[in-house]
Amino acid sequence: MLKKKQNSKLKIIPLGGLEQIGMNITAFEYEDSIIVVDCGLSFPEDDMLGIDLVIPDVTYLKENLDRVKGFFITHGHEDHIGAIPYVLRDVNVPIYATKLTMGIIEHKLREHNMLTKVKRKVVKYGQHINLGCFRVEFIKTNHSIQDAACLLYTSPSPR
C-alpha cells in the first residue's frame, strides 16, 4: 500500500487558513491520492458588506476530484468544519472525524438537507484509516472543544 515510486514527492497544499483566522483546509497529495484536512470557513471583514461567511476556494480539489479520497476533520470549530456543507456539494467524498465532531458535522449537514448524501465514518483515537497511499491515525489532544484530535499522516514519501 505505501510503496514509493521514483521521483514522487509529497505535496502539501494549503487551500485556506494561512495569514488569516479561519478557513482552515489543507490538501496532502502524493501521486494519485489526495486527502484533505479540515474544511473551515471564516467570517467577513468589516468592509465585506452583504457577505455572511467566506468559504475556501476548492477549485484544485474539483479539478482533481478523481484523486480526492476523503476529508479528515480535527475538531468541531467553525473555522475547521463550517464550509463542509458548501464544499461537499462539489467534492462529495467521505468524512472521517471523532464522535462529537461528527455529531456537529451531521447537524450542519441536516440543516442543508445533505445528511443522507454524504458518507461519514466516526473514528476512535488510535484508529488508523488507509485511503489511497495514505495512512492516517487519530490521536487525542487537548483543545478548547471536546473530542479534538491531531492527525499522524503516513505516506510513501521519505521523512
Residue spans for each PLM region:
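Generic start-of-chain signal for non-secretory N-termini
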Residues: 1-14, 18
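Beta-strand-turn-beta hairpins that frame and shape the catalytic cleft
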Residues: 5-10, 32-33, 128-136
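Divalent metal-coordination and catalytic microenvironments
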Residues: 12, 38, 75-76, 143
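Pre-active-site segment of Zn-dependent metallo-hydrolases
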Residues: 18-23, 30-73, 85-93, 97, ...
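Short beta-strand scaffold segments in enzyme catalytic cores
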Residues: 24-28, 149-152
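N-terminal Rossmann-fold NAD(P) dinucleotide-binding loop
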Residues: 80
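Metallo-beta-lactamase
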Residues: 100-148
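Conserved small/polar residues in nucleotide/adenosyl-binding loops
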Residues: 153-159
